[in-house]
């Protein structure tokens, strides 16, 4: 930032800029530690993403400088790079928003060593975070995708709401969620954001919209054993092994578990497919490549 604004601010201005940046960043972190409101986490997360993108811009600008310094005079190069850096940050933010609002369908074919009358088409979507930023329009997109894919069953492994049902109710999203249907049903489990503050109301609203919420429960659906675990925040939740006790595991077994933290243990159980969410595909690039 000091480099970016150097032509327009003097030494004192650069000190003020450094002080303000330091105050904002550390003030937000202190606010997070003191738990000054639940939205503080989101504000801090957004600010950290901005700082990360600024770091990417600084790296890209430096690389461009190394490549172009032999071909451009100092002043034109300096002006060009000062224009490039903020545009690069804006481009990253715009690309991130585009990705967030543009769902991508990925197809996976899984073969299991259990008898099935016919192949099963399962639609999986997690971490919808229905709230201020994501709502009715995104639900309609999801419904259209599931219809186009002709899924037999829909699984929603957690974080359907963004902490509360306030925005869900205010924006009247229920009719849109009710349109999400499948021949064998729509099933959900609760994730950490469903557990934070409004667990009972979230579960109630999901069920009122026609979803079956599995909270540490097992359900047989057309010859398929469906297991749903609540989030790790449920300290009393039984293990997947305990949930499977006494169940007919000769049937195909599908597990919904919001966080994939126990996937190695589950691999040793008679579970054929586990679907999870939580990780948001690495959250921020380039973590999505890992």
Residue ranges of model-derived segments:
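Non-catalytic terminal accessory segments
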Residues: 1-101
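N-terminal signal-anchor transmembrane helix
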Residues: 40, 67-125, 131-149
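Soluble catalytic domains of enzymes that build or remodel membrane lipids, polysaccharides, and related
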Residues: 114-290
């Amino acid at each position: 930032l000091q480099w970016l604004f150097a032509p327009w601010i003097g030494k004192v201005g650069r000190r003020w800029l450094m002080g303000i940046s330091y105050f904002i960043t550390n003030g937000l972190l202190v606010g997070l530690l003191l738990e000054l409101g639940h939205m503080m986490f989101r504000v801090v997360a957004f600010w950290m993403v901005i700082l990360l993108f600024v770091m990417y811009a600084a790296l890209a600008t430096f690389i461009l400088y190394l490549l172009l310094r032999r071909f451009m005079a100092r002043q034109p190069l300096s002006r060009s790079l000062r224009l490039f850096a903020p545009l690069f940050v804006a481009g990253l933010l715009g690309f991130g928003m585009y990705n967030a609002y543009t769902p991508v369908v990925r197809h996976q074919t899984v073969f299991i060593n259990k008898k099935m009358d016919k192949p099963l088409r399962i639609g999986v979507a997690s971490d919808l975070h229905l709230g201020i930023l994501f709502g009715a329009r995104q639900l309609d997109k999801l419904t259209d995708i599931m219809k186009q894919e002709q899924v037999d069953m829909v699984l929603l492994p957690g974080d359907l709401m963004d902490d509360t049902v306030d925005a869900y109710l205010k924006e009247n999203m229920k009719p849109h969620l009710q349109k999400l249907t499948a021949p064998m049903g729509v099933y959900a489990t609760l994730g950490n954001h469903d557990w934070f503050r409004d667990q009972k109301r979230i579960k109630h609203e999901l069920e009122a919209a026609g979803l079956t919420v599995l909270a540490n429960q097992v359900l047989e659906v057309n010859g398929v054993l469906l297991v749903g675990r609540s989030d790790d925040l449920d300290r009393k939740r039984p293990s997947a092994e305990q949930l499977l006790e006494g169940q007919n595991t000769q049937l195909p077994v599908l597990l919904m578990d919001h966080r994939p933290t126990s996937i190695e243990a589950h691999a040793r159980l008679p579970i054929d497919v586990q679907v999870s969410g939580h990780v948001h595909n690495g959250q921020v690039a380039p973590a999505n490549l890992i």
